[in-house]
Amino acid sequence: MQTSLNRALNGLRVSRETVEKLEHFASLFQKWARSINLVAPSTLDDLWRRHILDSIQLFQLSPAPKTWVDLGSGGGFPGVITAICLSETESGWVHLVESNNKKAAFLRVALRETAARGTVHPIRIEEAPAEIPTCDAISARALSDLSQLLEYCAPWMTVEASRTIAFFHKGRDYQLEIDKAVSRFQFDLVKHASVVEPDSVVLEVANLSRRTK
């Protein structure tokens, strides 16, 4: 187990205490996944690399602890993993937005049992800005295409003087999504190569605004 874990972490800087919390989360996840569809069943055998490592890389792209909003948190990737990683810091908090009650119940258990820094909001994404009016960072994974993700993020990112940044995991067709999104929005974009899949990226978006006709 330890050898495969070290291989999965691939040299990322993670403390022993955080690794123990991640191991406990993985155990909880496998248990709950037997009765709730948290991720594609075909990926369960590669949980550490496909899901946990993929989430850790996002947290490590952020230079400082932040108040995060994780949209469509589902099985906890990347929201719970980010909240666990924030346990190493003295600040920062993750708001996990998940409207599915069964998944929200799992997320609450995962946060509680790993002493992670987060809160679950069992609401629709469109309702989240009213409940969480400000944030420093937004994340989403396997949720929607880039144009729709930017629509979700607009209430936080298009307000005057907003410094909110967003991180989105994207697969091989990410450039097509970017080309579509730029017809509706202007934004600064950084493409981070994925440490998990060679043809995938993490898109970092900042300075979002709507295009005027």
From Swiss-Prot:
Subcellular location: Cytoplasm
Record-level GO cellular component terms: cytosol
Pfam families noted in UniProt: GidB (PF02527)
Keywords, sorted A to Z: Cytoplasm, Methyltransferase, rRNA processing, S-adenosyl-L-methionine, Transferase
Superkingdom of the source species: Bacteria
Reaction(s) catalysed (UniProt annotation): guanosine(527) in 16S rRNA + S-adenosyl-L-methionine = N(7)-methylguanosine(527) in 16S rRNA + S-adenosyl-L-homocysteine
The keyword Cytoplasm appears for this protein: yes
Entry keyword Zinc-finger: no
EC number, as in UniProt: 2.1.1.170
Main location: cytoplasm
Physiological role: Specifically methylates the N7 position of guanine in position 527 of 16S rRNA.
Protein name (database record): Ribosomal RNA small subunit methyltransferase G
Gene label: rsmG
